[in-house]
């Protein structure tokens, strides 16, 4: 069997030696034994990493449940609420408005071909409040806030500030992680409402002001398509999205590698992991909510006929 080579990323951690030696160390002979060993080690590392993260989540939840007075201490929570929520409003509002405009712009011709352009607003607003708004707001929070949290906590780890807190009998989990996780959990649903509102207004602007659809028809069909179930489902999911962003970002910061490169890698990894958590949770929670609604309302009225 002819041997090739495959890339071994773990050697990229080594920073000593010449660059040519590092590149040579990253090329490992490819055969069945090495391939099985490599992929097996990656699986083991992934399982161990998930176990460490689950332990991190359990400790955070224990701190919140067992020490609610410390967890909701306004002096620690208020700055995080401001950083996560207030400072994220512009980017969430702008992206939400433009998403609504784009959906109206792309969907109008298809609906007009069917003679149903007056119902375009209902379809767009249902999609925005149920799926697009919560996911969009969560992704913006993950990009703007999650990376910053991971970088901040990673810098504290690299500069040994976390060890100093432990030496002074302070709990980094209670003082640093809990306020940030709570802030993300509380503010993400609020930002989702901003995203929903601006998305609906953006779609209205294009549909009514540009394409000339009747304004009363736009809002009438919005009321027909969007019941209490859609906004409730979107806000319900956004709570889990925010908690996932806070937990993942803090975990990546607490476990970053030494050096400036480690902090940058932690920030990048926090966004990637947060985005994956958002889309996975969105699928799971969407199926859960659909099943719950079908159980509560076996026969739902249709507005498509």
Region annotations inferred by a language model:
Residues 28-77, 252-257:
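Short, membrane-interfacial amphipathic segments enriched in basic
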Residues 71, 80-136:
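Active-site cofactor/substrate anionic-group-binding motifs, chiefly glycine-
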Residues 95-98, 138, 142, 178-207, ...:
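Hydrophobic alpha-helical transmembrane segments that constitute the membrane-spanning cores
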Residues 106-129, 197-239, 248-269, 289-305:
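Membrane-interfacial helix-loop-helix connectors in multipass membrane proteins
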């Amino acid at each position: 069997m002819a041997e090739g080579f495959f890339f071994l990323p773990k050697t990229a951690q080594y920073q000593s030696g010449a660059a040519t030696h590092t590149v040579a160390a990253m090329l490992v002979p490819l055969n069945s034994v090495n391939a099985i060993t490599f992929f097996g080690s990656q699986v083991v590392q992934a399982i161990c990493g998930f176990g460490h993260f689950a332990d991190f989540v359990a400790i955070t939840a224990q701190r919140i449940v067992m020490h609610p007075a410390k967890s909701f201490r306004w002096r620690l929570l208020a700055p995080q609420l401001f950083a996560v929520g207030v400072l994220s409003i512009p980017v969430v509002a702008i992206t939400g408005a433009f998403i609504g405009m784009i959906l109206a712009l792309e969907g109008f011709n298809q609906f007009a071909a069917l003679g149903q352009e007056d119902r375009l607003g209902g379809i767009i607003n249902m999609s925005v409040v149920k799926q697009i708004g919560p996911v969009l707001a969560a992704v913006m929070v993950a990009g703007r806030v999650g990376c910053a949290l991971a970088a901040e906590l990673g810098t504290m780890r690299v500069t040994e500030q976390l060890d100093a807190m432990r030496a002074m009998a302070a709990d980094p989990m209670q003082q640093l992680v809990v306020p940030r996780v709570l802030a993300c959990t509380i503010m993400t649903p609020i930002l989702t409402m901003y995203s929903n509102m601006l998305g609906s207004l953006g779609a209205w602007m294009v549909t009514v002001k540009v394409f000339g659809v009747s304004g009363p028809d736009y809002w009438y069909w919005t009321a027909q398509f969007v019941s209490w179930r859609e906004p409730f489902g979107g806000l319900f999911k956004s709570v889990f999205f925010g908690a996932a962003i806070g937990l993942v970002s803090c975990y990546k910061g607490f476990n970053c590698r030494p050096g400036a490169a480690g902090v940058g890698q932690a920030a990048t990894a926090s966004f990637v992991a947060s985005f994956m958590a958002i889309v996975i949770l969105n699928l799971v929670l969407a199926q859960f909510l659909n099943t719950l609604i079908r159980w509560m309302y076996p026969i739902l009225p249709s507005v498509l006929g």
